[in-house]
C-alpha cells in the first residue's frame, strides 16, 4: 500500500474511533426504568435485586435503570453515600445519555398516588424521547388480583394447619380511590381461603376489622405476610416488630400466636413476572 493509502486508512480509522467516543451512550439502545417507592433496608433490597435480575434476563439488550419516588428514602440513602435518582432525575439522565425509547415500569402494588405522580412526570418528559411509556403496577385488573392472591397464598409455610389463620399486610392508600383494590384483594383472599385475610396500614380493610374476625373465629395462631413489594420497615416494625403497637404484639395480647414470614412480594419470581408481563405488553404495542 502506498503512503497516501496508508494516510487515508489512518484518517478513517481515527475518525471512526472519534465517532465511537462521541456517540451518545443510548443511541442504539432502548432503556427500561424500574420505578419504586424505595427502601433503605439492606435486607429488603433483595427484592429489588431479584426483579433487576429477572428484568435483565427477560429483556437482554435493554439498559436497566432504577428510580425511587420517595424523597425521604433518597435523602436517607444519600447520607450513607448511596445515590438514587428520582424519576425526574432518571429521565433527564436518560435524555442526556442519548436514549430514544424509554419504558418506565411502576413497581408499586396499586395505581395509587405514587403511580399517578409517575404518569404526570412521564407526560412532562414525553417530548424528549421518540417513545416514552409507563406500564401499570402489580394489581391493574381483577386478573392481576386473582393471580397475585393465588401466588401469595401458595407462599404460606406448608406446616400451617387448616385452623391457623393467614393475615396479609397491605400498605393501603388512604383516601385514594385505588384503595378499593385492597378491598377487592381481601375479598378474593377470603373466597380462596376461609381463614385468610387482608388488612392495611393506611386504608381498608383495617387491622381492627381483621382482628375482630380472628377473635370471633377463636384463632390461636396466625401467619403474617407482607403484601408489599419489599419486606421493609412496615413489615419488620408495624407487622412483626416487638413494639406495643405492632400487629404481632396486639395479636399476642389477644391470645394469638404469630408466625411472621418476612419476604417481599418482589422476591417471588412468579409475582415479579406479573410486573414484567405488564412491561412486555407495553413494549410490544
Where do the model's predicted regions map?
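Hydrophobic h-region of N-terminal signal peptides that target proteins for export
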Residues: 9-17
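Active-site-proximal alpha-helix that buttresses catalytic centers in soluble enzyme cores
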Residues: 19-285
Amino acid at each position: 500500500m502506498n503512503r497516501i493509502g496508508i494516510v487515508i486508512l489512518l484518517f478513517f480509522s481515527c475518525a471512526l474511533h472519534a465517532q465511537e467516543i462521541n456517540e451518545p451512550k443510548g443511541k442504539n439502545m432502548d432503556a427500561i426504568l424500574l420505578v419504586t417507592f424505595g427502601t433503605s433496608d439492606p435486607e429488603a433490597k433483595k427484592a429489588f435485586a431479584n426483579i433487576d435480575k429477572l428484568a435483565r434476563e427477560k429483556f437482554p439488550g435493554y439498559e436497566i435503570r432504577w428510580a425511587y419516588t420517595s424523597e425521604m428514602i433518597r435523602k436517607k440513602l444519600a447520607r450513607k453515600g448511596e445515590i438514587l435518582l428520582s424519576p425526574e432525575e432518571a429521565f433527564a439522565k436518560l435524555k442526556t445519555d442519548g436514549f430514544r425509547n424509554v419504558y418506565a415500569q411502576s413497581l408499586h402494588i396499586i395505581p395509587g398516588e405514587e403511580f399517578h405522580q409517575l404518569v404526570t412526570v412521564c407526560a412532562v418528559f414525553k417530548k424528549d424521547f421518540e417513545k416514552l411509556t409507563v406500564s401499570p403496577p402489580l394489581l391493574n385488573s381483577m386478573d392481576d388480583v386473582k393471580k397475585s392472591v393465588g401466588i401469595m397464598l401458595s407462599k404460606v409455610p406448608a406446616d400451617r394447619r387448616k385452623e391457623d389463620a393467614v393475615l396479609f399486610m397491605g400498605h393501603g392508600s388512604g383516601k385514594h380511590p385505588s384503595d378499593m383494590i385492597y378491598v377487592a384483594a381481601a375479598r378474593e383472599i377470603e373466597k380462596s381461603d376461609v381463614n385468610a385475610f387482608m388488612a392495611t396500614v393506611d386504608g381498608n380493610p383495617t387491622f381492627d376489622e381483621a382482628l375482630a374476625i380472628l377473635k370471633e373465629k377463636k384463632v390461636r395462631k396466625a401467619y403474617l405476610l407482607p403484601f408489599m413489594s419489599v419486606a421493609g420497615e412496615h413489615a419488620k416494625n408495624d407487622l412483626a416488630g416487638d413494639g406495643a403497637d405492632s400487629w404481632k404484639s396486639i395479636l399476642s395480647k389477644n391470645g394469638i400466636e404469630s408466625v411472621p414470614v418476612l419476604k417481599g412480594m418482589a422476591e417471588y419470581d412468579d409475582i415479579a413476572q406479573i410486573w414484567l408481563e405488564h412491561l412486555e405488553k407495553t413494549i410490544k404495542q
